[in-house]
From Swiss-Prot:
Protein name, per record: Large ribosomal subunit protein bL9
Keywords: Ribonucleoprotein, Ribosomal protein, RNA-binding, rRNA-binding
GO term, biological process aspect, one: translation
NCBIfam families: L9
Organism for this UniProt entry: Rickettsia conorii (strain ATCC VR-613 / Malish 7)
Gene: rplI
Pfam families linked: Ribosomal_L9_C (PF03948), Ribosomal_L9_N (PF01281)
PROSITE patterns per the UniProt record, alphabetical: RIBOSOMAL_L9
Signal peptide limits: none
Family label: Belongs to the bacterial ribosomal protein bL9 family.
Function: Binds to the 23S rRNA.
Length: 171
C-alpha cells in the first residue's frame, strides 16, 4: 500500500513523505490514527499544496511539546510500595501509574501510551523512563521505587553522590 504521511511518524518518516508500507500497517494503524492518507493522484496534488500548512501545524505542536519537555526535565517520580524481604514488589509499577503521577506533577495530561518501559518495574531502585512527547522528541524521567520515604531519600542521596563522582572523573 502506498501512503502519504500527514504527521511525522517515528522511525517511518516526516510530513509529506510518500512511502510503501504493508497493507495491514496502513489499513489498521496509519489510516485510522490519521497519520497518513492513501497516495492517490488527487491526494498527492493536495499534499503538495497543503504541505506548508501541515508543517506549520507540526511546528506549533513541537513548540508546545518543548515547553512540556522543559517541565518534565529533571522530574523525579517516587513510588512507595510494599515489597518482599528481597526488594521485589507485590505487583509492578506500570506505565499508566507513571503517566498519572507525571500528569499530576506537571498539570498536563500525559498518555500512558507515551511512556516507554524497557522492562517492567518489579523491584525497588532507581529507573530511567523514556517519555515520547513527539515523533522527534523524547524526555527522560527518573522513577524511584522504594518501601518508604526514607528509603527513597537514601536512593536520591546515593544517586547525587554517583553523579558528583562522575562529574569529578570528567574534570
Amino acid at each position: 500500500m502506498e501512503i502519504i504521511l500527514i504527521k511525522p511518524v517515528r522511525k517511518l518518516g516526516k510530513i509529506g513523505d510518500i512511502l510503501k508500507v504493508a497493507d495491514g500497517f496502513g489499513r489498521n494503524y496509519l489510516l485510522p490514527q490519521k497519520l497518513a492518507i492513501r497516495a492517490t493522484e488527487p491526494n498527492k496534488e493536495l499534499i503538495v499544496k497543503q504541505k506548508h500548512e501541515f508543517e506549520a501545524k507540526d511546528k506549533q505542536i513541537r513548540e508546545e511539546v518543548e515547553k512540556i519537555n522543559a517541565l518534565i526535565k529533571d522530574q523525579q517520580l517516587v513510588f512507595i510500595r510494599q515489597t518482599s524481604n528481597d526488594g521485589k514488589l507485590f505487583g509492578s509499577v506500570t506505565n499508566k501509574e507513571i503517566a498519572d503521577k507525571l500528569s499530576e506533577n506537571i498539570s498536563y495530561n500525559i498518555s500512558h501510551s507515551n511512556i516507554i518501559l524497557d522492562k517492567q518495574i518489579k523491584s525497588t531502585g532507581i529507573y530511567t523512563v523514556e517519555i515520547r512527547l513527539h515523533a522527534e522528541l523524547n524526555a527522560i524521567v527518573t522513577v524511584i521505587v522504594a518501601r518508604s520515604e526514607s528509603e527513597a531519600q537514601d536512593y536520591l542521596r546515593e544517586q547525587k553522590t554517583e553523579t558528583s563522582e562522575d562529574l569529578a572523573e570528567l574534570a
